[in-house]
A protein has these predicted regions:
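Amphipathic, interface-forming alpha-helical segments with heptad-repeat character
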Residues: 14-15, 21, 53-166
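Domain-core and long-helix interface of multi-subunit machines
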Residues: 1-57, 112
């Protein structure tokens, strides 16, 4: 994570090696890249810092099978942000200006989107199976379905998020 050093009238941004920073002024991208270091004037621009490392997100999905039995599925999804500028435009990765008590919510927003997509795909697939079928040998089919659901999702594609592993 990069650091901001405040000086009179100016701010010095020192970027980290694993974060893509986007500097935006008047709706245009001024700078964009990994490991950037630069000076900026206070109140003249906005900074967004997007992590470039793969992120693992695991969660539990509970759905009913076709014979009305509850099935719990533990899902682990690894994703990365492939287009940092698109992600910064759609999600809250703001670094400056920001109040001290508020953190950027971009990764949380992406986690929620991934969870929603997986839940809807699993609900339709497991909901059509009997409990015995869901327990025995359906893991490969469900994994393939999740991979397909993530690949076909237009929101993930438009916001620069790519799924690495399911």
């Amino acid at each position: 994570m990069g650091t901001l050093h405040n000086h009179p009238f100016f701010i010095r941004y020192q970027g980290g090696a694993g974060d893509h920073v986007v500097q935006i002024s008047a709706g245009r991208t001024i700078r964009s890249g990994v490991g950037q270091s630069f000076w900026l004037r206070k109140g003249r621009c906005a900074l967004a810092e997007v992590p470039t490392a793969n992120r693992a997100h695991s969660f539990l999905v509970q759905v009913a099978s076709s014979d009305q039995q509850n099935v719990n599925a533990q899902v682990a999804v690894t994703y990365c942000i492939e287009n940092a500028e698109a992600a910064a435009a759609h999600y809250d990765f703001g670094l400056y200006p920001r109040e001290a008590k508020k953190d950027a919510q971009g990764l949380w927003q992406i986690d929620e989107t991934v969870t929603r997509i997986a839940h809807s795909a699993l609900a339709s697939t497991i909901g059509a199976m009997a409990l015995s079928e869901a327990i025995s040998g359906a893991l490969e089919r469900v994994s393939g379905l999740l991979t397909q659901a993530f690949a076909e999702n237009e929101q993930l594609q438009a916001t620069g998020v790519g799924i690495v592993d399911v």
